[in-house]
């Protein structure tokens, strides 16, 4: 992979910060990115930053926590586009964020300094996993990653501080890699088998209000399931609970954090007609999402990856 990741992150990060200002947050920024074979490029979007540079909101004494990131989308030509939150419950106009992503199979954002803003992204390219920081050259994490058909980071699942990575292999076994905070990963730990029943696995932060990062998974029948996090890498999830059915109307489900800037992680879903819907998080395990709100009328089927 070439050293430049092609991710143009500075402008996107600035726009995300602008959205946060409407929620009385302090803006921050970041630089352009890099990566290695055929070099995907990525830029950080302007995201809304948190108060005092931390991942806590200043509005309440016991402020809610949720990461705030742009939604990145990769089109069929390998171009990457960034959609930061607009501070009004939706997404801002897209901006170009990178190129040469034709060979990227999976991608997911990661926050390594626990400030609530992504610092870069892991990208599975062929049989390699690369980490693309927003402010320096890419890092080759390892080889042999073509055994995985799903790679996603839901946040800090193991309790150590930095974001971790989940990977599902072809036989349906889900594995957890703990993050060192620099893009590198520990050895893998087995989460469990039978995960090939799910078409989508995603998450970005705490969905249930207990301070532990969670995930949701959509099965082939269209049922969405919640896996509450434990914060223990040896057993990172509790038993699943049903969120609801009818999710087979969507061909993509992804979480990048808090879209509506209310301090709670949200979920985005794209239907088969290319419309985009936002499911606002509630922070409650019994009913983790509010009713959907359309935030994109069409055209989202042009993207083969969203992260």
Where on the chain are the PLM-derived regions?
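Trp/Gly-enriched beta-strand/coil motifs that build multi-repeat beta-propeller-like domains
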Residues: 2-307
């Amino acid at each position: 992979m070439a050293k430049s990741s092609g991710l143009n992150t500075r402008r996107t990060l600035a726009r995300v910060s602008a959205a946060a200002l409407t929620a009385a947050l302090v803006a921050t920024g970041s630089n352009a990115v890099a990566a290695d074979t055929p070099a995907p490029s990525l830029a950080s979007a302007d995201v809304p930053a948190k108060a005092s540079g931390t991942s806590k909101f200043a509005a309440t004494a016991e402020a809610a926590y949720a990461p705030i990131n742009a939604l990145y989308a990769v089109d069929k030509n390998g171009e990457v586009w960034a959609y930061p939150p607009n501070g009004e419950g939706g997404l801002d106009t897209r901006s170009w964020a990178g190129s040469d992503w034709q060979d990227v199979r999976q991608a997911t954002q990661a926050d390594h300094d626990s400030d609530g803003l992504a610092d870069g992204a892991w990208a599975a390219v062929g049989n390699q996993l690369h980490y693309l920081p927003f402010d320096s050259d890419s890092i080759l994490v390892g080889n042999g990653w073509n055994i995985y058909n799903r790679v996603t980071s839901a946040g800090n699942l193991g309790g150590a501080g930095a974001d971790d990575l989940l990977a599902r292999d072809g036989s349906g076994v889900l594995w957890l890699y703990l993050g060192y905070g620099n893009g590198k990963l520990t050895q893998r730990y087995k989460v469990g088998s039978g995960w090939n029943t799910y078409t989508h696995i995603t998450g970005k932060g705490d969905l249930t209000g207990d301070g532990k990062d969670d995930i949701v998974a959509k099965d082939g029948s269209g049922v969405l399931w919640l896996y509450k996090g434990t914060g223990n890498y040896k057993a990172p999830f509790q038993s699943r609970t049903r969120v609801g059915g009818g999710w087979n109307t969507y061909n993509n489900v992804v979480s990048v954090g808090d879209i509506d800037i209310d301090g709670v992680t949200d979920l985005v879903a794209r239907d088969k007609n290319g419309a985009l819907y936002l499911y606002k998080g509630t922070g409650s395990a019994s009913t983790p999402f509010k009713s959907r709100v359309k935030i994109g009328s069409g055209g989202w089927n042009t993207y083969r990856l969203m992260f």
